[in-house]
Amino acid sequence: MKLVLNQVSKKFDDKVILNEVNHTFEMGKIYGLLGKNGAGKTTLFNCVSQNLMVDGGQITLDDRLDYRDTQIGYVYATPRLPAFMTGYEFIKYFIEIHADEISEAKDPSDYLTLIGIEEADHHALIRDYSHGMQNKVQMLTSLITAPPVLLLDEPLTSFDVVAAHEMKKILLSIKPETIIIFSTHILSLAQDLCDEIVLLHHGDLRSIDASDFQSPDFEEQLIKILSDQAEGSEL
């Protein structure tokens, strides 16, 4: 399965966010989307998830322009969860309304334990969860339905070291059957986890293969590109 961006454009008023960008994202790979604040990473995710219409070009999934019937997993930077429910209640409800998309559902407690939520917190209100715990629950919903495309907006940044390590293992385990794209400001995370880094800069997408990650001046060259100081960079 492939997610293809073909001459995709998006702007708000006179500000161009995506300028006829082209890129192909393939199943079985993890992509890191890097860019400065305000570069348009969230806008790109919203276009892919069809929360926003593009102004030009097209986005296709598995050669289909209309893929609204395909589940797109989207983990937002700010969790969007019902604060009045407990973690257990929410996951139970989520499983019930997505029953036709889940092949072998587990007990909600099993899922919560999987992502490192302590048993004592399973029946606590979500509003009392830390930001990191809420992010775990939000990511869990995408793992339960196993969507073919998973968009992660600044994942792992609110997790502690142990939780981040566990989430990395989970992402690697679902990688063969998933197109995973995550935005991040943490270069070391992208280098550690990704098969390819995609830079979003001045409305354009630029791909960097994993083979370049270990270059001794990789980080320096990347910063130069994003700060418009690069001249003849080989990245």
Regions found by a protein language model. Give the residues of each.
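Conserved structural motif at the start of ABC-family nucleotide-binding domains
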Residues: L3-L5, L18-E20
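The feature captures the beta-strand-to-loop junction immediately N-terminal to the Walker
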Residues: Y31-K36
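Helix-to-loop junction immediately C-terminal to a conserved catalytic motif
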Residues: S49
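Conserved ABC transporter NBD signature motif
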Residues: V54-T70, S207-D209
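Catalytic Walker B motif of ABC-type/P-loop ATPase nucleotide-binding domains
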Residues: L150-E154, F159
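Helical segment within the ABC ATPase nucleotide-binding domain
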Residues: A164-P176
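Conserved beta-strand-loop-alpha-helix hinge in the C-terminal portion
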Residues: D204-S227
